[in-house]
């Protein structure tokens, strides 16, 4: 089954315009073969990016922002910098699930705002960082493509956190 999944993901990447693409999967990815379309793989919420999009938008923008503004257990949680807000894996999962549950440009903004508010630090000196994170997450959440990139970035961060915990 794994070889089949890998083959289907490869087809998704190749079907992206320009073919210089990467197809990733996680809990939000759905893919299937469309027999009416000659058996070609089709994507539904799949994380398919050109390499440039992935490097610039997912890694260079979203992951970089998360690493610079959040203390992430098992990744940078032991950092000497004290200007980041702490974010546990559980909270990141909740944010990711809310983002994945959004359809098109619609999402449950009230729940999303509540979950983001749980990041709010007690320390006054961390308020500017929290405001940046809250504002940036909201900007990304309301645009479908940006939201998809943020979900992918969160998946990478969560997987890295999981790897560090299990090591």
Region locations from a protein language model:
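Charged, helix-rich terminal subdomains or tails
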Residues: 1-167
């Amino acid at each position: 089954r794994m070889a089949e999944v890998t083959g289907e993901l490869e087809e998704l990447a190749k079907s992206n315009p320009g073919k210089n693409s990467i197809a990733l999967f996680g809990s939000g990815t759905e893919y299937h073969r469309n027999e009416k379309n000659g058996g070609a793989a089709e994507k539904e919420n799949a994380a398919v990016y050109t390499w440039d999009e992935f490097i610039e938008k997912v890694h260079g923008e979203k992951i970089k922002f998360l690493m610079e503004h959040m203390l992430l257990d098992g990744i940078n949680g032991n950092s000497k910098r004290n200007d980041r807000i702490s974010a546990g894996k559980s909270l990141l999962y909740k944010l990711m699930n809310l983002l994945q549950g959004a359809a098109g440009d619609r999402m449950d903004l009230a729940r999303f705002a509540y979950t983001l508010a749980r990041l709010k630090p007690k320390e006054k000196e961390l308020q500017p960082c929290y405001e940046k994170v809250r504002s940036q997450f909201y900007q990304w959440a309301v645009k479908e493509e940006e939201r998809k990139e943020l979900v992918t970035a969160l998946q990478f961060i969560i997987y890295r956190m999981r790897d560090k915990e299990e090591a």
